[in-house]
UniProtKB/Swiss-Prot annotation:
Entry keyword annotation includes Transmembrane: no
Organism, scientific name: Arthroderma benhamiae
Signal sequence range: 1-20
Protein name: Subtilisin-like protease 7
PROSITE patterns assigned to the protein according to its UniProt record, in alphabetical order: SUBTILASE, SUBTILASE_HIS, SUBTILASE_SER
Entry keyword annotation includes Signal: yes
Gene: SUB7
Length: 400
C-alpha cells in the first residue's frame, strides 16, 4: 500500500519516567533508532531559555566525551522551533546523557526516534482513474470530473514525502523544490511523492489543477526515514507557509507509524500555525487512534474508499477519521513522465489536500477549519465504514 509506516501492529505508546521527564516508549515491533532521541520542551519556553538549555546540552555532552571517556555519540543534531511555540531537538545520546537531560525541569518529555517506511505498494498498469470523477459527483460510476475553473489557483500544497519530480509535465512549472531532510538527492527516486503531488495539483490527475506544489523530502529512495526527520520537514513547511501566507497553504502527509507524541505535537503545531493538514489514516485495517500523526485531533485524517463506495479492505478506521476519499487503484504521475496506479490511504489523502487547495481557490478560507468545510460538503455513502467511523465521502460541491 502507499501509506508509509513500520509499526505492525500499531498501538498507543506506553510511557515511563526516568528521574522526572517522561520517556514515551514504542511498542514491540517498532524499529527504533539506536541511541537516538527526540526531546520536547515545556510549553511556553522562551527562545532565551531554549538557547540556554541547548548550550547546557552541548557543554554536558562535550564534557562527557572528553572527561569521562563516554561512548562516542553525535550529540544534538537538529533543533525545532515551530512558529506556534513548539520547541525541541533531536540527537544521538547515550543512556547516561539522556538521564541527565531527563532531570531538567524544562523538559516536557523524551521520545525514542523511530523509523518510518513505505509498505509494499500495489501497482496495476493500464487501469483508468476514477477518483477525480467521484470527488466531483454525488453518484458513483462517473467518468467526468466537474469542477470550478479556479481549480485551486493561488494556493500552495506542501507535500511532505519522498520528494516530487518537479519537471513532470503534469505540473506545468507550478512545482518547486522546497527542502530535503533525508539525503543529498533533490529528486523523487521512489515515486510515492510524485504520485501524491499529481493527485493534488496535476493538470490531468489533480483535484486542484492550478495549485502550486512544494516538495519537502523526508523519506529516501527506499521510502525510509525517521520521525525526527519528518518533524524537521513539518517545521520547515510551517515556517515557509507562514512567510508566504498560511491561509493559502495546505500540507499533505501520506505517512505515519506507531503512536508518537512528538509527531502528533508537530502536526498540531502545523494546524495551530494556520495550515490545513491532511494525513493518511494508515493501511493496517485497525483503529487509526493507535497511529501518528493520524491520531492528532486538530488535523484532517483520511481513510480510503473503493470505486464501489465501500471502505478499502486495507484502510484504518475509527473515531479519529474525519472523511473518506478515493484510495483504491488511483492513477497519478510517476517520476520521469507518464503515470502509474497505486493504492493506499496515501492515495486518498491527497484528494483531501487537493480539495482543501481547491476550496482556497474558491475563496472558502484556509487553515484547519477547512476540514470542517470538507466534512460539510461530504456525502453520506460509505458502506461498512468500520466501527465508530464516519461514512462521509468527500465531494467538491459542484452539484453534479
Amino acid at each position: 500500500m502507499g501509506f508509509i509506516t513500520k509499526a505492525i501492529p500499531l498501538a498507543l505508546a506506553a510511557a515511563s519516567v526516568i528521574n522526572g521527564a517522561e520517556i514515551m516508549e514504542t511498542r514491540a515491533g517498532v524499529q527504533t533508532l539506536a541511541d537516538k532521541y527526540i526531546v520536547v520542551m515545556n510549553d511556553g519556553m522562551t527562545d532565551k531559555d531554549f538557547d540556554s538549555h541547548r548550550s547546557w546540552v552541548n557543554r554536558t555532552h562535550r564534557r562527557r566525551l572528553i572527561r569521562r571517556g563516554a561512548k562516542a555519540m553525535g550529540g544534538m543534531k537538529h533543533t525545532y522551533r515551530f512558529p506556534t511555540g513548539l520547541k525541541g531537538y533531536s540527537g544521538h545520546f547515550d543512556e547516561q546523557m539522556i538521564n541527565e537531560i531527563s532531570k531538567r525541569a524544562d523538559v516536557k518529555y523524551i521520545e525514542r526516534d523511530a523509523r518510518v517506511q513505505i509498505n509494499a505498494i500495489e501497482q496495476q498498469d493500464n487501469v483508468p482513474s476514477w477518483g477525480l470523477a467521484r470527488v466531483g459527483s454525488k453518484e458513483p460510476g462517473g467518468t467526468t470530473y466537474y469542477y470550478d475553473g479556479t481549480a485551486g489557483e493561488g494556493s500552495t500544497a506542501y507535500v511532505i514525502d519522498t520528494g516530487t519530480d518537479i519537471q513532470h509535465e503534469e505540473f506545468e512549472g507550478r512545482a518547486t523544490w522546497g527542502a530535503n531532510f533525508v539525503d543529498d538527492m533533490d529528486m523523487d527516486c521512489n515515486g510515492h511523492g510524485t504520485h501524491v503531488s499529481g493527485t493534488i495539483g496535476g493538470k490531468t490527475f489533480g483535484v486542484a489543477k492550478k495549485s502550486n506544489v512544494v516538495a519537502v523530502k523526508v523519506l529516501d529512495c527506499n521510502g525510509s526515514g525517521s520521525n525526527s526527520g519528518v518533524i524537521m520537514g513539518m517545521e520547515w513547511a510551517t515556517k515557509d507557509a507562514q512567510q508566504k501566507g498560511a491561509d493559502k497553504a495546505v500540507a499533505n502527509m501520506s505517512l505515519g507509524g506507531a503512536f508518537s507524541q512528538a509527531s502528533n505535537d508537530a502536526a498540531a503545531a502545523i494546524a495551530k500555525g494556520g495550515v490545513f493538514l491532511a494525513v493518511a489514516a494508515g493501511n493496517d485495517n485497525v483503529d487509526a487512534a493507535d497511529s501518528s500523526p493520524a491520531s492528532e485531533p486538530s488535523i484532517c485524517t483520511v481513510a480510503a474508499s473503493t470505486e464501489q463506495d465501500s471502505k478499502a479492505d486495507f484502510s484504518n478506521f475509527g473515531q479519529v477519521v474525519d472523511v473518506y476519499a478515493p484510495g483504491d487503484s488511483i492513477t497519478s504521475a510517476k517520476p520521469g513522465g507518464g503515470s502509474q496506479v497505486l493504492s493506499g490511504t496515501s492515495m486518498a489523502t491527497p484528494h483531501v489536500a487537493g480539495l482543501g487547495a481547491y476550496l482556497i481557490g474558491l475563496g472558502k478560507g484556509g487553515g484547519p477549519g477547512l476540514c470542517d468545510t470538507i466534512k460539510q460538503t461530504a456525502i453520506d455513502v460509505i458502506q461498512n465504514p468500520g466501527a465508530s467511523t464516519t461514512s462521509k465521502l468527500i465531494n467538491n460541491g459542484s452539484g453534479m
